[in-house]
């Protein structure tokens, strides 16, 4: 990661890149994108908790574009970036399947529940008070105040019964729970 970063953020992006993004005058920023959320296989589908904490401890994996991600720009850095340049974050979550436009793999209920909980944990990390588990992790990572996270994208261009079942489970999750 660069040393000379925008707002001197630890693990932040280069100033010139952030200035270009800022000058676009966008209103929101989608992260981590689409296909990266789904992964090539269920093992490479993105998990929120693999994108926070010390960069050298974050697992890397192959992407469908034939290179590896370091997860160097993780969820926390993304939320800070949005805060720094006044963008509304739109977090993309896995909806219980790999890419439907390649060889789709629909997760069984137990694994789908793990990804549902992962999404709930990410939302808690971003928005909950510090006396919750994930709010406390955010505080330990240097940001005691909740981030402004209003938008969640469920899946990436997904469709069908499996998608609708996950969407229904996600939208009916009224209570954010703190399971790691």
Model-derived features: positions:
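Non-catalytic accessory regions flanking glycosidase/transglycosidase catalytic cores in CAZymes
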Residues: 1-180
């Amino acid at each position: 990661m660069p040393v000379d970063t925008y707002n001197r953020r630890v693990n932040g992006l280069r100033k010139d890149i952030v200035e270009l993004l800022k000058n676009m005058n966008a209103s929101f920023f989608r992260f981590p994108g689409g296909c990266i959320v789904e992964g090539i296989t269920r093992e490479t589908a993105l998990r929120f908790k693999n994108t926070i904490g010390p960069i050298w401890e974050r697992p890397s994996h192959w992407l469908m574009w034939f290179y590896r991600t370091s997860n160097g720009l993780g969820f926390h850095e993304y939320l800070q970036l949005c805060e720094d340049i006044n963008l509304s974050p739109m977090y993309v979550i896995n909806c219980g399947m790999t890419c439907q436009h390649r060889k789709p793999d629909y997760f069984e209920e137990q694994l789908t529940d793990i990804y549902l909980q992962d999404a709930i944990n990410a939302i808690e990390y971003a928005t909950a008070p510090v006396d919750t588990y994930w709010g406390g992790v955010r505080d330990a990572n240097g940001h005691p105040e909740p981030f402004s996270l209003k938008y969640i994208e469920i899946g990436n261009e997904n469709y069908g019964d499996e998608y609708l079942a996950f969407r229904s489970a996600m939208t009916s999750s009224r209570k954010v729970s703190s399971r790691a």
